[in-house]
């Protein structure tokens, strides 16, 4: 068993180790993505706070203001109706309108899709700037989006997302094989040896012990990071497994029940309907219906939600009569739905507040540490075997002489 586990552990490390290092390091930076993005791009993402509020204060945006921003964009021939509109969460933030590629445009599987982001000042309705989300670059405006697309897509579109999912699945196998290799005999001395790290005057020995003991100690966190990463990129791989253990509610697309293309409510009415359903929630994003018969999709964050930022509450609003068609409420989730709703807050660390985010940002260096210590250990063993093989060959040549 250990021989097979050793081979699996070795080859996964050699094949996917570099990708895991890249994902870990980019994840460390993305733990503070929005904060760093604002620091790098103050003119694009920060404006003067509304009267009576200090920069950074939490704020709720009135439906009338959302309607005013949407109307301004529709009237301007440079923009038109956006696909989604992100609302400012704090005083000093901007609206972010997104425009996806035209419906007829087809991206190659390895091509990174590009979305146009337009930022709007809530107070003046002035466009502060725009950028193409998905384009790569190291400029101040493109640095954080580039890191995001490396982390999620390896800058290779849908094909890169599959590679990331396979890498996450390989990490799960690495954890399992590593635990098999770590497992000591049930004796006090061997258990203590498996749980301690000593230098002993040898760096290769230190690297081996650090790799072995450290791997055991961080295995639970690595497991959560790997499983959640696979779920974010390929949910169809994870959801059936979770559903087999605990029921997961099927995701059915909502359809308007009343009215037609000619009868269409405004976005402000959709926001009002969502706020009436969750009076204490804060609207964070609204998706506009691409066709007249499709509903609005409003995203909110409720006060007690684990997920920070945009939250995970979703409300489908009939675009013909403003009735609520469907609700996804993470605070009422049960079983498999509850488990899946926990994955993102655990992956980012925000489930445990600021301390959790700091921990995850530091944890992003763990793959680099394991790749380095594992490589040092393997090279030492490989070199030792090569020398032993060379000595055996020379000995046989001497015997024949």
Residue ranges, per PLM feature:
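Conserved histidines in hydrophobic membrane contexts and catalytic metal-binding motifs
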Residues: 1-401
């Amino acid at each position: 068993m250990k021989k097979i586990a050793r081979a699996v552990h070795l080859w996964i490390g050699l094949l996917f180790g570099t990708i895991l290092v890249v994902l870990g390091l980019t994840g460390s930076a993305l733990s503070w993505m929005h904060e760093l993005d604002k620091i790098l791009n103050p003119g694009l993402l920060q404006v003067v706070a509304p009267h009576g509020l200090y920069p950074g204060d939490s704020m709720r945006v009135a439906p009338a203001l959302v309607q005013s921003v949407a109307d301004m964009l529709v009237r301007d021939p440079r923009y038109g109706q956006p696909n989604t509109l992100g609302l400012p969460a704090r005083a000093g933030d901007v609206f972010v309108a997104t425009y996806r590629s035209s419906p007829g445009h087809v991206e190659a599987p390895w091509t990174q899709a590009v979305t146009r982001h337009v930022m709007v000042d809530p107070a003046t309705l002035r466009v502060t700037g725009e950028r193409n989300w998905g384009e790569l670059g190291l400029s101040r405006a493109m640095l954080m989006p580039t890191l995001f697309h490396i982390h999620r897509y390896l800058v290779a579109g849908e094909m890169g997302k599959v590679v990331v999912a396979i890498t996450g699945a390989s990490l799960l196998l690495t954890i399992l094989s590593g635990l098999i290799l770590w497992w000591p005999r049930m004796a006090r001395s061997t258990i203590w040896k498996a749980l301690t790290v000593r230098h002993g005057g040898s760096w290769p020995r230190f690297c081996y012990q650090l790799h072995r003991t450290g791997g055991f100690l961080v295995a639970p966190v690595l497991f959560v990071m790997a499983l959640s990463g696979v779920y974010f990129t390929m949910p169809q791989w994870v959801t059936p497994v979770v559903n087999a253990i605990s029921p997961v509610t099927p995701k059915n697309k909502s359809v308007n029940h009343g009215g037609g293309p000619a009868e269409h409510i405004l976005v402000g009415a959709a926001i009002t309907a969502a706020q009436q359903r969750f009076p204490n929630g804060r609207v964070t994003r609204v998706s506009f219906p691409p066709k007249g018969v499709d509903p609005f999709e409003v995203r909110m964050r409720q006060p007690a939600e684990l997920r920070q930022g945009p939250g995970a509450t979703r409300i489908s609003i009939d675009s013909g009569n403003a009735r609520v068609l469907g609700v996804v409420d993470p605070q009422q989730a049960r079983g498999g739905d509850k488990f899946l709703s926990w994955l993102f807050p655990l992956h980012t660390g925000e489930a445990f507040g600021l301390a959790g985010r700091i921990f995850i940002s530091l944890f992003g260096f763990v793959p680099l540490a394991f790749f380095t210590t594992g490589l040092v250990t393997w090279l030492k063993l490989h070199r030792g075997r090569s020398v032993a093989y060379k000595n055996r060959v020379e000995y046989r040549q001497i015997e024949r002489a």
